[in-house]
UniProtKB/Swiss-Prot annotation:
It holds the Pfam family Homeobox_KN. The gene is Pbx3. Belongs to the TALE/PBX homeobox family. GO terms for cellular component: nucleus; transcription regulator complex. The lineage of its organism: Eukaryota, Metazoa, Chordata, Craniata, Vertebrata. Residues 130-234 are annotated as: PBC-B. This is Pre-B-cell leukemia transcription factor 3.
Length: 434
């Protein structure tokens, strides 16, 4: 221990016994008779050593290099190194059982997979652009969707550029700091025992510290991509963007089948082709429409009347055209006094079938004035051409009374035929079906 004390005193530049170092060698200690007087001197020397340690940071680079060179050239330096190795061997037992490698962070792996799937990280192979193209194709591929697709790709490219720029800055800072620490540890390994394995462990610790910054960068990038997808590729937003023509077609089918507004698969496919949408979108639209109609029957009755008026006008024009065609082609025009009959066209048959629904008749007060005038016009045309009585008078086309007590839809009964109340020789016979 005396050798170790003398070695430390020599390296510090001051002898613990109160004597300065001369020529790199410490002077012999004083006789044992002066131990009482040397107590204060030792305290003062320890204070001087601490002062020198505290002033190391104030030294210039040349002074530090000179002291480092003197330490490396000192003859007691190997002995100091061996002592430090023994101390480390005793105190280093507690850290040997520590885990060498930590498992990969699952959250970081999820972020990496998401960025790779969206085309942000890794080589650009489509990623989110392919998703945008699929969404545009599913929604019909209109010009508006093409514009949104191009906007989505532009913003996704911008997010990708920002991500890679910040990732390069992160990697550069991490590499610079890691290189600095490794050089520092290699330099210190000349004075104190530091193994290459310990340097690798320190590098791993540095990378784990920096991984929190990397995780924050990837998390913010994933949030930006999710916001971008919700803005451009959200299915709910696409459902609200049906064209006016598609909405008209769907509403017309709904109100013309109000007794049973559940289209078959063939009808859904036909409506999807007409509206340039998918079959699933048609199913979703009818489901939402049924729910809204049952909740607000009074509100949607006015809309039903409008579509009923449109159907009535179409049927009236079809009947008038058929009658005019018969008058043109036949030598004698049938009237109410003649003995003869003629068949109505399909469109007229369909309209005549609207006389009653589920066996119930509806008053004309349920239909607006415009609808009533169209019904009167149609009845007048039929009476003039076929001797038809007022069996159709003042009947509403659509009615909200198709819901049962449980809020469900009643199945419409299909009338077998629609005939005149008085079957004279000039009556009209028409077999119809739903």
């Amino acid at each position: 221990m005396d050798d170790q004390s003398r070695m430390l005193q020599t390296l510090a530049g001051v002898n613990l016994a109160g004597h300065s170092v001369q020529g790199g060698m410490a002077l012999p200690p004083p006789p044992h008779g002066h131990e009482g007087a040397d107590g204060d001197g030792r305290k003062q020397d320890i204070g001087d050593i601490l002062h020198q340690i505290m002033t190391i940071t104030d030294q210039s680079l040349d002074e530090a290099q000179a002291k480092k060179h003197a330490l490396n050239c000192h003859r007691m330096k190997p002995a100091l190194f061996s002592v430090l190795c023994e101390i480390k061997e005793k105190t280093g037992l507690s850290i040997r059982g520590a885990q060498e490698e930590d498992p990969p962070d699952p959250q970081l792996m999820r972020l990496d997979n998401m960025l790779l799937a969206e085309g942000v990280s890794g080589p650009e192979k489509g990623g989110g652009s392919a998703a945008a193209a699929a969404a545009a194709a599913a929604s019909g591929g209109s010009s508006d969707n093409s514009i949104e697709h191009s906007d989505y790709r532009a913003k996704l490219t911008q997010i990708r550029q920002i991500y890679h720029t910040e990732l390069e800055k992160y990697e550069q800072a991490c590499n610079e700091f890691t290189t600095h620490v490794m050089n520092l540890l290699r330099e210190q390994s000349r004075t104190r025992p530091i193994s290459p394995k310990e340097i690798e462990r320190m590098v791993g610790i540095i990378h784990r510290k920096f991984s929190s910054i990397q995780m924050q960068l990837k998390q913010s990038t994933c949030e930006a991509v999710m916001i971008l997808r919700s803005r451009f590729l959200d299915a709910r937003r696409k459902r609200r963007n049906f064209s006016k023509q598609a909405t008209e077609i769907l509403n017309e089918y709904f109100y013309s089948h109000l007794s049973n507004p559940y289209p078959s698969e063939e009808a859904k496919e036909e409506l999807a082709k007409k509206c340039s949408i998918t079959v699933s979108q048609v199913s979703n639209w009818f489901g939402n429409k049924r729910i809204r109609y049952k909740k607000n029957i009074g509100k949607f009755q006015e809309e039903a009347n409008l579509y009923a008026a449109k159907t009535a006008v179409t049927a009236a024009h079809a009947v008038a055209a058929a009658v005019q065609n018969n008058q043109t082609n036949s030598p004698t025009t049938p009237n109410s006094g003649s003995s003869g009959s003629f068949n109505l066209p399909n469109s007229g048959d369909m309209f005549m079938n609207m006389q009653s629904l589920n066996g119930d008749s509806y008053q004309g007060s349920q239909v607006g004035a415009n609808v009533q005038s169209q019904v009167d016009t149609l009845r007048h045309v039929i009476n003039q051409t076929g001797g038809y009585s007022d069996g159709l008078g003042a009947n509403s086309l659509y009615s909200p009374h198709n819901l049962n007590a449980n809020g469900g839809w009643q199945d419409a009964t299909t009338p077998s035929s629609v005939t005149s109340p008085t079957e004279g020789p000039g009556s009209v016979h028409s077999d119809t079906s739903n």
